[in-house]
Amino acid sequence: KKNVFNKKVKYWTLERDGKDITVLSAVGHLYSLTPDNPKDKVYFDLHWAPLFEIDKKYKNYTKDYVRAIKKYAKDADSYIHACDYDIEGTLIGYHALKYGCGEDALKKSSRMKFSTLTKKDIVEAYENRIPIDRHQVDSGVARHILDFYFGVNISKALMKSVSAAKKRFLKLSAGRVQTPTLSILVDREKEIKKFVPEPYWLIKALLDGEIEADHVDGKIFDKTRAEEIFSNCENSDAAVDKIKYSNSTTKPPVPFNLGGLQSEAYNVFGFSPKKTQTIAQSLYTAGYTSYPRTSSQKLPESLDFKSIFLQLSKNSEFRTHISALPAKLKPNEGKKEDAAHPAIHPTGILPDKLDKDELKIYELIVYRFISV
């Protein structure tokens, strides 16, 4: 049953195995770091606080989510953490439990782990819950603390330094990832500006109007030499000197992780990485594909390939390619692993309606899954 708290926050109630269950949501992080003493020149003493208390202007909308969690968490017998199974998702749910439900809630909590939003996977994750991964929690906490130390403290120092030199205030920012990345871009831009292009010539022969042959010297940097070769070859007959046959085996591509999907979508469609990730997330939320923010290039043995292919075969275009697959299905996996999630793959559920860009990404994922 769908309900609404305070006219803003949706939540659901249901019964399973004789238990009343309330399903509540967060809206990203509900808690963040803030300094113990805002007047300190450098911030190293920090604590976690609700976002709506830290940023009342832009994050006030999170208040009702925190209130809903606190209200419906009272007197609960147990708690289930079902946020995305990655470091950030784990930290979001952990803080909701610790600060929204209370410290004791952590002792009565379990974790659902799933990589697709199909009914089958959700039920399996519910029935096979695991403990909350404290390593993921610690990793998330450490990242947030380091981001705060670098981002806030160095940004303050940077603005103070530049303002003193320029005799005026400038709002600047630095960050743990942002600043080194900017440095790489600056170095690359300097290389580009220093580059002096050197002209060269390519000589090609068009044979029988169909075959294009390159001169054996490839790039020719001497114009006189290029003109001499061209003059000698112009209007001449070509003779086949040797024919060589060889067989080569091409391995199938590896399954998509997020980076691979973004790279391929850019090469094929010109989509920006952000656009690809947004579309992949919407496909995951709709239950059509698996969790997108994964670094894995591996597909687990537990994945029911035959069932997925059977469902995908309801689409005639997919069926044409699937029917050409060998009887024994063994994917060509890459080296990269992710303990939390497998490589991106279709769930088998065919979309009812997608816009043209969503369809492009969905088909890209499906055809890569078939081809591996």
Model-derived features: where do they sit?
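Generic beta-strand/beta-sheet core signal
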Residues: 26, 82-84, 206, 259, ...
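Intrinsically disordered, low-complexity regulatory segments
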Residues: 1-150
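Long, highly charged, low-complexity internal segments
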Residues: 3-4, 13, 18-60, 169-281, ...
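Short, conserved phosphate-binding/catalytic loop or strand-edge motifs used
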Residues: 115-122, 258-259, 279-289
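Hydrophobic (often cysteine-bearing) scaffold residues that line and stabilize catalytic clefts
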Residues: 88-92, 138, 142, 173, ...
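Secondary-structure transition/capping motifs at alpha-helix termini
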Residues: 101-108, 268-273, 286
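Extended, highly charged linker/hinge segments and catalytic-adjacent loops that couple domains
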Residues: 133-136, 140, 147-151, 286-365
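C-terminal or mid-to-C-terminal helical accessory/interaction module adjacent to the motor/catalytic core
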Residues: 61, 68, 74-75, 117-208, ...
